[in-house]
Amino acid sequence: MDTHGWGSRILVGAALAALTMLGACNGDETAERNQLPVFVSGSVRTTAYDGASDDLLTAGLGKTGLASAAAPAFADPSRPTAAELRRVAIWSNYRALVDMSANGGYGRFWGPNVDLDGNDTLGEGKIAGTEYLAYADDGSGRKNVTLLVQVPASFDPAQPCIVTATSSGSRGVYGAISAAGEWGLKRGCAVAYNDKGGGNGAQELGSNTVTLIDGTLANAVLAGSASLFTANLTSGDLAAFNSRFPNRYAFKHAHSQQNPEHDWGRATLQSVEFAYWALNQQFAPLVDGSHRGVRYRAGDITTIAASVSNGGGAALAAAEQDTRRWITAVVVGEPQINVRMAPNAVVRESGRPVPSFGRPLADYATLANLLEPCAAASASLAGEPYLSALPLATTQSIRTQRCATLAAAGLVSGADTQSQAADALAQLHAAGYLADSDLLQASMWDSQAIPAIAVTYANAYTRSSVADNLCNFSFATTNAATGAVAAPAASPMPAVFGLGNGVPPTAGINLVFNTGAGVDHRLATPDASFAGALCLRQLWTNGMLDMPANVEAVRVNANLQGKPAIIVQGRSDALVPVNHASRAYVAQNSISEGGRSQLVFYEVTNGQHFDAFLPVAGFDTRFVPVHYYNVQALNLMWRHLKSGAPLPPSQVIRTVPRGGTPGAAPALTSANLPPISTAPGANAIAAGAGAIDVPL
């Protein structure tokens, strides 16, 4: 309690002291000034949105505008404004994490128009409120984690709440707006976003152009520490690289040389602390005529750490690292998390140990990148969804050639393509991939999700520079017909903040293998750049370039310190296998926390990693939206925190695929989505003493 300046005004001081103590007992304001956290770098941008022309959730587009397949237009495509870039970023990021088709559930089970009870009552769903935007940095000017707080007009300062929405993947700061931000805003909570220090930061090396915090562009030299990301190259190194490798791009997650995943938990905690500052700034009274006081202190606000994929992993890491009670509870979907497993931990299915669990992403992603193109050729996977812009004949040739090269290298067995493909698939099973995800192995590689992740994370885990061209890969613009590196007709940089996802290929910037002048990695060699894929794999298997140490640095201990928590994941996840992520985390948690644990786990059959793929033929008939259960989990946690309702126990949720004709599946109904049960019976998942047992 600050008594400075009271002087001899004893009576007034005593009265103020009494009021202060009463306020403190009720979590209210004190005479202390609200101080911007020390990690906030530069100024804070504050913008109010009226909920009509522009808003927090839809950027003025509403439910209808978000559903449009066409991105909002820029008045001048070469120089979009910050407001235009924000609108496109919200449009693209919202759509990236949910099924946007009406038959698939948009506008009926979720969407801006759907209230928290699942009813279509909110019209276009625009939400008025205020945004606070700033960087978090360590003083170097190179971290520059983007922090964003949205405070809806419906926020009740007497019943405060915060929901974190750490970006998924390597997305920009709006990267979890549909996954977690939307629920928080509808609940009347402040939403604390951050981009995890990856944040879709791009640099066009040839022009030395970078993005700023709002997506607008600047010369890297002039931007200085205001840049979202600038590669750590001298002017001489940059010129030499551009001479040898023109039309190339650097991306923050891959090329910051900081292993940003190490700080994802910290960034999430910082976003919560920044949200506290914003709420005090908005709702605390003035203490001296010009400065706001402190109404909320750490632990005063109900705070749910939420998000999906990488954002989910960040939320778990934050809860583990939390020493000041910033976080009350955790709700995450399909978390990408690297768990430090105890020797006695085990994952079982109906009593039988699975062949592999708890591997880090650096291991399973580089293995999948090597084997998936071959495994996809297996006749047992006939009818798998096709998710590539390449002609089918080209893709089939890639698969055959990858199998042949793997066989020649002694990495698969078999005298013909089918036997080689069967062996590749068997190796994936032995590495912990479930048969439930078999029909997605092709899609994960054909869509370039796995190659993109393997290259980006290998760069991050080795702290490689863009100039290193790790394993002979780079990011470049290419000729649409041939795949060869080429100058673009127009730079992709003006739109990269709005349309990019931070992991090339994205926004017109592709993943290339540096054969000759460089070619799209799928087309650079008949076996789709096998040599590069093998190199990435060997970085892990041979422990090269400090990769093991940097991976060890991102591992977590699965100790949530007694916080109530829910994890949701689809059993068919082929990007982040459930054996290595959620199941492994729950098993280790039962050691790390033991009887203190309040973690429950819901495994969704027929659920996979990318709900945005569900409208695609073959996805629509086979898979259900995991997002639906993420929302249910948030509602369950809210009731648990606010009314003491017990969380339903860990369980398998046995969903029903829509079926029908690929590309024309019948509309999703509640019959496809059974509720999370309070008494799961034979579907209960058991966890304890280092073991998790999941019923098949």
UniProtKB/Swiss-Prot annotation:
GO terms for molecular function: hydroxybutyrate-dimer hydrolase activity. It catalyses: (3R)-hydroxybutanoate dimer + H2O = 2 (R)-3-hydroxybutanoate + H(+). GO terms for cellular component: extracellular space. Its main location: secreted. It comes from the Bacteria. Keywords: Hydrolase, Secreted, Signal. It is an enzyme of class 3 (hydrolase). The keyword Lyase does not apply. GO terms for biological process: butyrate metabolic process. It is found in: Secreted. The active site is at S309. The keyword Disulfide bond does not apply. Its EC number is 3.1.1.22. Residues 1-26 form the signal peptide. Pathway: Lipid metabolism; butanoate metabolism. Participates in the degradation of poly-3-hydroxybutyrate (PHB). It works downstream of poly(3-hydroxybutyrate) depolymerase, hydrolyzing D(-)-3-hydroxybutyrate oligomers of various length (3HB-oligomers) into 3HB-monomers. HAMAP family: 3HBOH. Belongs to the D-(-)-3-hydroxybutyrate oligomer hydrolase family. This is D-(-)-3-hydroxybutyrate oligomer hydrolase. It comes from Burkholderia vietnamiensis (strain G4 / LMG 22486) (Burkholderia cepacia (strain R1808)).
